[in-house]
Amino acid sequence: MAHTKAGGTTRNSRDSAGRRLGVKATDGQFVNAGSIIYRQRGTKIFPGNNVGRGKDDTLFALISGIVKFEDRINRKFASVYAVEDLKAKK
């Protein structure tokens, strides 16, 4: 009976690929309607003006314009403003 028993398998030997989360459009960048602004799990950043939220909490632009990340009371928001609106504010 001089033989080795079968070795057990390891349970933790695999690693999943990264999910490519994070900022996809930076502050001040022009985006087209439907463009993804931020990929996230949960609402780390909330949708602001002209920004929608997908079922996986992805933020996307509802109109074409300039992205602005804003801090409001204890929350961060991503908004998209039309170029004409930004010119009118100046």
From Swiss-Prot:
Molecular function terms from GO: structural constituent of ribosome
Biological process terms in GO annotation: translation
Region (Disordered): 1-21
Keywords assigned: Ribonucleoprotein, Ribosomal protein
Pfam families: Ribosomal_L27
One GO cellular component term: cytosolic large ribosomal subunit
Signal peptide: none
HAMAP family: Ribosomal_bL27
Family, similarity comment: Belongs to the bacterial ribosomal protein bL27 family.
The name this protein goes by in its record: Large ribosomal subunit protein bL27
UniProt lineage: Bacteria, Bacillati, Mycoplasmatota, Mycoplasmoidales, Metamycoplasmataceae
Encoding gene per record: rpmA
